[in-house]
Amino acid sequence: MIVSLWMAEDGGMLFNNRRISRDSEVISDLGALASDSVIFISDFSSKLFRDAPFSVIESSNPLECAGAGDYVFIENLRIKPYIEKTEKLIIYKWGDKYPSDFKFDISPEKEGFKFCESYEFSGKAHEKITREIWVR
């Protein structure tokens, strides 16, 4: 599966069970990458994808449901238990730090991923967003 997520520079994803930030340009970029594929999302993320012009499947545990080649977007889930199923990571990073109490729970390099590419673009809420792609 191909797991995508967004986080602050320090790996922070949530604070007090709330997303630390968001940007609709990330959703658009992910939709373009996934093209004709379906993106699995959690109930927590459903509001972000409500008006998306592409297909999503909402699940209480999208990491469990997704198979090889499927896209998954996570915000409030730990990837570590599903790392062996993960073939690619798409990580969107804000150029800022935010208070957080839920962080990305792996180091891609330590889990055997290799950095593939980086792309910077402007968002609606963030001047600079960096998309990193890591592959096995």
Language-model segments: residues:
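Enzymes that bind and transform nitrogen-containing heteroaromatic metabolites
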Residues: 1-136
